[in-house]
């Protein structure tokens, strides 16, 4: 909104020209979301306490988690709220990717809110039946897949050459490719157009990431810390993908409107940092499914929009491992005579059962997350 208001006035005041820069507005989005959470979280936490919106802890989980019973949950409300306000202020509101990201965040947060509310109301950990959560996630995934397959025309492959006469890089080939194309990390010349199959693929990405973050949200600061790390990597990827010169130099697809996605990612980072202040061990508040389902979903959507879907496996490796641990545990239990691969799933509980303290698990997973995020960014040069 600020861009639409102030940038047209740049000739009246030179400072308004700053609003044209993605980096300036991204920094503004980070700061705004961070400040909003820091300012309003204490009041929201007190309100949640008065409403008795406390965490319901599974009785089959680690015994050390029983002390968390009653800790205010649904803190994702002020994460989502601060992101929405920050994006409203700093992003170009006529950018369709921003609109879809915002709508997706709202829809998935509604699903998460219903899940949290039912857990609190009935004082158990069941919440919204899984089929309904999958419905919300699938609905969002299909919308994103349909948009990218049928309507999005923003993906280009560009080749530049040095003009020896003037010593300047010039575009010699600009080729539009379908947004249903997936690009392989480490290989600049290998890409596959999934065509109509991109819709179920996009749906799978959204559903998987939404559930992966949800499953990871079991220790103080774990899910939100990893989200900050992953969002920082996505900010780099979205910025370079939206810059034609950098994208061409790195031999990655140029997404003509991806730069604006960086502003949205900035809001994620700011809100995440603010929430971590209150969610660090011992947590004063939990994000609940209103936060984890929605934030995980938009991480997947961002990767789809900037055409780095497959890099999710690398930069989101901890989330992927957490989700896979649950899938493998259930599969092994059902089909191999009730045998368990892990002491407890998700994976963070396995390490708790192995004697690691909660803070050890969290910080060691952070370290792995940082390493994998750096590897993901490094793939930009290994092509």
Curated annotation (Swiss-Prot):
It comes from the Bacteria. Pathway: Cell wall biogenesis; peptidoglycan biosynthesis. The chain crosses the membrane at residues 26-46, 73-93, 98-118, 131-151, 182-202, 221-241, 258-278, 283-305, 360-380. It catalyses: UDP-N-acetyl-alpha-D-muramoyl-L-alanyl-gamma-D-glutamyl-meso-2,6-diaminopimeloyl-D-alanyl-D-alanine + di-trans,octa-cis-undecaprenyl phosphate = di-trans,octa-cis-undecaprenyl diphospho-N-acetyl-alpha-D-muramoyl-L-alanyl-D-glutamyl-meso-2,6-diaminopimeloyl-D-alanyl-D-alanine + UMP. It is a multi-pass membrane protein. Keywords: Cell cycle, Cell division, Cell inner membrane, Cell membrane, Cell shape, Cell wall biogenesis/degradation, Magnesium, Membrane, Metal-binding, Peptidoglycan synthesis, Transferase, Transmembrane, Transmembrane helix. It is found in: Cell inner membrane. CDD domains: GT_MraY. The keyword Lipoprotein does not apply. One of its GO terms (biological process) is regulation of cell shape. The keyword Nucleotide-binding does not apply. InterPro entries: Glycosyl_transferase_4, PNAcMuramoyl-5peptid_Trfase, PNAcMuramoyl-5peptid_Trfase_CS. GO terms for molecular function: metal ion binding; phospho-N-acetylmuramoyl-pentapeptide-transferase activity; UDP-N-acetylmuramoyl-L-alanyl-D-glutamyl-meso-2,6-diaminopimelyl-D-alanyl-D-alanine:undecaprenyl-phosphate transferase activity. GO terms for cellular component: plasma membrane. Its EC number is 2.7.8.13. Its cofactor is Mg(2+). Catalyzes the initial step of the lipid cycle reactions in the biosynthesis of the cell wall peptidoglycan: transfers peptidoglycan precursor phospho-MurNAc-pentapeptide from UDP-MurNAc-pentapeptide onto the lipid carrier undecaprenyl phosphate, yielding undecaprenyl-pyrophosphoryl-MurNAc-pentapeptide, known as lipid I. PANTHER family: PHOSPHO-N-ACETYLMURAMOYL-PENTAPEPTIDE-TRANSFERASE, PHOSPHO-N-ACETYLMURAMOYL-PENTAPEPTIDE-TRANSFERASE HOMOLOG. Belongs to the glycosyltransferase 4 family. MraY subfamily. HAMAP family: MraY. This is Phospho-N-acetylmuramoyl-pentapeptide-transferase.
């Amino acid at each position: 909104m600020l861009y639409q208001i102030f940038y047209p006035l740049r000739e009246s005041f030179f400072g308004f020209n700053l609003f044209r820069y993605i980096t300036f507005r991204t920094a503004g989005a980070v700061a705004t979301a961070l400040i909003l959470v820091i300012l309003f979280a204490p009041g929201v936490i007190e309100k949640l306490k008065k409403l008795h919106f406390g965490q319901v802890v599974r009785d089959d989980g680690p015994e050390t988690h029983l002390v968390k019973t009653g800790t205010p949950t649904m803190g994702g409300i002020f994460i989502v709220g601060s992101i929405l306000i920050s994006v409203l202020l700093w992003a170009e509101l006529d950018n369709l990717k921003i609109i879809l990201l915002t709508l997706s965040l709202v829809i998935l947060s509604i699903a998460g809110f219903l899940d949290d509310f039912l857990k609190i109301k009935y004082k158990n950990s069941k919440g919204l039946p899984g089929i309904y959560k999958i419905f919300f996630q699938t609905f969002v995934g299909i919308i994103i897949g349909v948009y990218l397959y049928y309507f999005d025309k923003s993906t280009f492959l560009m080749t530049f050459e040095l003009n020896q006469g003037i010593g300047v890089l010039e575009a010699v080939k600009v080729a539009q490719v379908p947004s249903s194309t997936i690009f392989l990390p480490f290989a600049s010349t290998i890409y596959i157009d999934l065509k109509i199959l991109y819709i179920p693929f996009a749906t799978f990405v959204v559903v998987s990431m939404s559930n992966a973050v949800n499953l990871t949200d079991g220790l103080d600061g774990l899910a939100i810390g990893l989200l900050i790390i992953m969002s920082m990597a996505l900010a780099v990827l979205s910025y370079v993908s939206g810059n034609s010169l950098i994208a061409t130099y790195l031999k990655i697809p140029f997404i003509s409107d991806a730069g604006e996605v960086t502003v949205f990612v900035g809001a994620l980072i700011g809100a995440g940092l603010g929430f971590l202040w209150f969610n660090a061990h011992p947590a004063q508040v939990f994000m609940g499914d209103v936060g984890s389902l929605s934030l995980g979903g938009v991480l997947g959507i961002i990767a789809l929009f900037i055409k780095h879907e497959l890099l999710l496996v690398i930069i989101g490796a901890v989330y992927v491992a957490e989700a896979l641990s649950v899938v493998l545990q259930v599969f092994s239990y059902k089909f191999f005579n009730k045998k368990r691969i892990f002491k407890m799933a998700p994976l963070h509980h396995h390490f708790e059962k192995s004697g690691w303290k909660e803070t050890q698990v969290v910080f060691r997973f952070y370290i792995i997350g940082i390493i994998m995020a750096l590897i993901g960014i490094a793939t930009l040069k290994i092509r």
